[in-house]
């Protein structure tokens, strides 16, 4: 959705949020009657197209400042955690659900956990874990080939979720759950789906009814939390026992839990923090990565010329490994994934057009200014990611699916970048594209998500 050119005040006098344009609303409830949690991003994007890059909306008693101008959005992201923190409801909800980890942590808790989780998910560790991704990708390929041979309909979205659950469980605690081997719904996946939906519902609720009048759905969510929580605690206990018996695992961790437990005593995470971080990884990887891959496939299906070029790239990457390994439909060397620039561009273009986290909500901690507007502490600020990423000032043909825009060669020809740049888009466009966030709290799972997506697409296309 394209938004109009921004109307940013040039006067030196700051205005208050109450003076911002916006959709108005009814007494007491504001625009709550128009609010649908599952469509929140579309509703807010529609208002951004009408009212510009900064506006105010009231939902019930709560006013929210909504921004979609890249530099202001980056200001919010870069000033975390001192200047802005997640929505004030996030940590209480995550803590009571036993999910309090890096995602919900703030201040000193976040500073202590961040380097540990980042190290566990960095390219060096993922290179050691890459065979796990290869195995899961081979299983997905075999499942789809068998379905094709038998003429069985494939539920692509469900299988991609199984795939990401399998990869995440193996990476997180060395357990091969192999949900891809099942045709019926997997119990673990069902519990994770219920928890994921429960988080979204509770964070979007204006009244915490689950605390004093729990519904049947609330009780089912709590049951799923207990079941998965008990399993995760068992994995933690087992990982500790393994490391006591095999000290080498401190230097050569076999999965994420080993890497987290290898921290020295001064940095060590509590069981609750370990539990929260492992649960967060399970939930984050299950939904976001699978949706990105599904959107990429959907967009490719409507562009046969791009599909053909991507297929050629995948076949060439597999052929380059032919001399070092047996013929395989799956890339077996992590370095080979670097030879997939167009496929990576397809993933990035899917994230640009269909971001899996299209908005983020924050609470101001300190007084600041955004686009000439005074932001007081405790002000709720929402950033919208799709409007700037589909703005013609940042991306040519912004509504078109053009993965080649991310390639350095086209950027040089179009004047958007240079042939020597690692990304084919200009600096301004890169600032407008933030699917993994930005600033100090840049998503630690970015590399893993891109790696999984490239592996699945390369295998499927070849």
Regions from the PLM with identified roles:
Residues 1, 56, 173, 184-265:
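Cytochrome P450 catalytic core segment centered on helix I
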Residues 2-99, 103-112, 131-142, 178, ...:
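N-terminal membrane-proximal hinge/A-helix region immediately C-terminal to the signal-anchor transmembrane segment
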Residues 18-25, 130-134, 187-194, 245-257, ...:
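Cytochrome P450 I-helix active-site segment
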Residues 31-52, 230, 234, 329-371, ...:
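Conserved cytochrome P450 K-helix E-x-x-R motif and the immediately C-terminal K′/meander segment
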Residues 33, 38-46, 86-87, 267-276, ...:
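Cytochrome P450 heme-binding Cys-pocket and its upstream "meander" loop
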Residues 164, 168, 224, 228-233, ...:
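Central I-helix of cytochrome P450 enzymes
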């Amino acid at each position: 959705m394209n938004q109009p050119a921004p109307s940013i005040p040039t006067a030196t006098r700051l205005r208050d949020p109450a003076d911002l344009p916006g959709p108005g609303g009814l007494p007491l409830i504001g625009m709550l009657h128009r609010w649908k949690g599952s469509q929140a991003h579309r509703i807010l994007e529609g208002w951004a197209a009408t009212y510009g890059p900064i506006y105010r909306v009231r939902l019930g008693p709560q006013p929210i400042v909504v921004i979609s101008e890249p530099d202001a959005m980056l200001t919010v992201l870069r000033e975390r955690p001192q200047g802005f923190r997640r929505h004030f409801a996030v940590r209480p909800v995550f803590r009571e659900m036993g999910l309090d980890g890096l995602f919900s942590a703030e201040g000193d808790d976040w500073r202590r956990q961040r380097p540990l989780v980042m190290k566990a998910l960095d390219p060096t560790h993922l290179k050691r874990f890459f065979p796990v991704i290869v195995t899961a990708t081979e299983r997905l390929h075999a499942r789809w080939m068998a379905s094709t041979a038998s003429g069985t309909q494939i539920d692509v979205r469900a299988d991609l979720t199984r795939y990401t659950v399998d990869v995440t469980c193996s990476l997180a605690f060395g357990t091969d759950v192999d949900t891809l081997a099942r045709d019926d719904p997997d119990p673990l996946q069902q519990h994770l789906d219920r928890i994921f939906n429960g988080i979204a519902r509770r964070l979007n609720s204006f009244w915490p009814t689950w605390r004093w009048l729990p519904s049947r759905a609330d009780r089912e969510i709590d049951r799923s939390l207990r079941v998965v929580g008990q399993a995760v605690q068992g994995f933690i206990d087992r990982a500790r026992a393994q490391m006591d018996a095999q000290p080498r695992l401190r230097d050569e961790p076999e999965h994420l839990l080993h890497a987290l437990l290898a921290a020295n005593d001064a940095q060590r995470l509590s069981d609750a923090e370990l539990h929260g971080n492992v649960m967060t990884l399970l939930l984050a990887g299950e939904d976001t990565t699978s949706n990105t891959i599904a959107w990429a496939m959907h967009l490719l299906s409507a562009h046969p010329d791009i599909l053909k070029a991507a297929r050629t790239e995948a076949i060439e990457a597999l052929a380059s490994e032919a001399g070092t390994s047996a013929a395989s439909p799956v890339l077996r060397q992590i370095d080979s994934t670097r030879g997939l620039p167009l496929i990576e561009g397809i993933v990035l273009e899917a994230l640009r057009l269909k971001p899996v986290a299209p908005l983020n909500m924050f609470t101001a901690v300190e007084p600041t200014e955004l686009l000439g507007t005074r932001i007081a502490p405790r002000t709720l600020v929402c950033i919208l990611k799709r409007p700037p990423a589909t703005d013609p000032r940042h991306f040519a043909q912004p509504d078109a699916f053009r993965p080649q825009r991310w390639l350095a060669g086209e950027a040089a020809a179009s004047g958007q970048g240079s042939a020597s740049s690692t990304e084919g888009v200009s600096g301004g466009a890169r600032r407008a594209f933030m699917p993994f966030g930005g600033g100090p709290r840049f998503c630690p799972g970015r590399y893993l998500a891109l790696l999984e997506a490239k592996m699945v697409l390369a295998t499927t296309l070849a």
